């Protein structure tokens, strides 16, 4: 029954506000009247909704200051959204939470950078060791005279043994 009475009271106050506005603004060409009435209706509704919420919150909460602050910030944020603003009011607690989150993310990224840097240093050292093992070391001058095909290059007199080693030999087999 109390809720019904409260609803009737709310409706009668809204009607009273509308009647008062109609009598004050008798000019039928008033273009801003619907907007003014809407804003006043929203303000009254917020007022009626916030008072019982605040009473319950203050009775049940041990930390009433934070509850009051949170309710006021919520009401102002609602009004800002209704007005079309995208910005919001934040409390110091929310700012501290966001700063803690940012600091935690920065620490995580610094640790990741440190790990990646360590891995890159290890990879560079590994590549240096591989490069050192693969380095060609000069062993001095190698005599390649015996290694190339000299059949078409040297004559019979120029061979060391005096004969061409590439010519076929006569082989006799015993029968």
UniProtKB/Swiss-Prot annotation:
Any GO BP: monoatomic ion transmembrane transport
Annotated transmembrane regions: 29-51
Pfam families noted in UniProt: Rota_NSP4
Positions glycosylated per UniProt: 8, 18
Annotated binding of Ca(2+), by residue: 120, 123
Annotated Gene Ontology cellular component terms: extracellular region; host caveola; host cell rough endoplasmic reticulum membrane; membrane
Cytoplasmic-side positions: 52-175
Gene Ontology MF: a single term: toxin activity
Stretches in topological domain Lumenal: 1-28
Known role: Plays an essential role in the virus replication cycle by acting as a viroporin. Creates a pore in the host endoplasmic reticulum and as a consequence releases Ca(2+) in the cytoplasm of infected cell. In turn, high levels of cytoplasmic calcium trigger membrane trafficking and transport of viral ER-associated proteins to viroplasms, sites of viral genome replication and immature particle assembly. The secreted form acts as an enterotoxin that causes phospholipase C-dependent elevation of the intracellular calcium concentration in host intestinal mucosa cells. Increased concentration of intracellular calcium disrupts the cytoskeleton and the tight junctions, raising the paracellular permeability. Potentiates chloride ion secretion through a calcium ion-dependent signaling pathway, inducing age-dependent diarrhea.
Subunit structure: Homotetramer. Interacts with the immature particle in the viroplasm. Interacts with host CAV1, early and late in infection. Interacts with host integrin ITGA1/ITGB1 heterodimer. Interacts with host integrin ITGA2/ITGB1 heterodimer. Interaction with microtubules blocks trafficking to the Golgi apparatus.
Free-text note regarding domains: Binds 1 calcium ion per tetramer.
Designated name of the protein: Non-structural glycoprotein 4
């Amino acid at each position: 029954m109390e809720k019904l009475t409260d609803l009737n009271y709310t409706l009668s106050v809204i009607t009273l506000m509308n009647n008062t506005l109609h009598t004050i603004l008798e000019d039928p060409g008033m273009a801003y009247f619907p907007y003014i009435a809407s804003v006043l209706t929203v303000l009254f509704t917020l007022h009626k909704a916030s008072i019982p919420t605040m009473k319950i919150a203050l009775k049940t909460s041990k930390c009433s200051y934070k509850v009051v602050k949170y309710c006021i910030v919520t009401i102002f944020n609602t009004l800002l959204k209704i007005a079309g603003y995208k910005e919001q009011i934040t409390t110091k607690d929310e700012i501290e939470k966001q700063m803690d989150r940012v600091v935690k993310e920065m620490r995580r990224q610094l640790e990741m950078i440190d790990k990646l840097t360590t891995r890159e240093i290890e990879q560079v050292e590994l590549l240096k060791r591989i490069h050192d093992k693969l380095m060609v070391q000069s062993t001095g001058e190698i005599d390649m005279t015996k290694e190339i095909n000299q059949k078409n290059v040297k004559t019979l007199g120029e061979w060391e043994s005096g004969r061409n080693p590439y010519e076929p030999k006569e082989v006799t087999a015993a029968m």
